[in-house]
Amino acid sequence: MKQVFNPYLPAGEYIPDGEPHVFGNRVYVYGSHDRFNAAIFCVNDYVCYSAPVDDLSAWRYEGVIYKKKQDPLNKLGIRLLFAPDVVQGVDGRYYLYYAYDFLGRMGVAVSDKPQGPYA
């Protein structure tokens, strides 16, 4: 039996519900961020990976794009942020939308670049 693995994330990196988007000449992947062996999911800050659209074997870690404690309702960092997605607005800026825990609320952060950082 062959081992199944993620083709672009390093071992130990867990980004479920990934959302790929093409902005310019790169593919960006956004998603929830799980921690290895954590009792719950979506506990890490958001990160981003990207690759050139013409070489999807050359993935690059863009870094932390949004820290969960940045959310005004999550200053202690105890709430889960999950299912993020990014869109480019008509103003050219990038908007990161995410679900705020299981409270029926959405959050939004803004950046001038698709790889963040978002505020």
Regions found by a protein language model. Give the residues of each.
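Carbohydrate-active catalytic/glycan-binding domains of CAZyme proteins
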Residues: 1-119
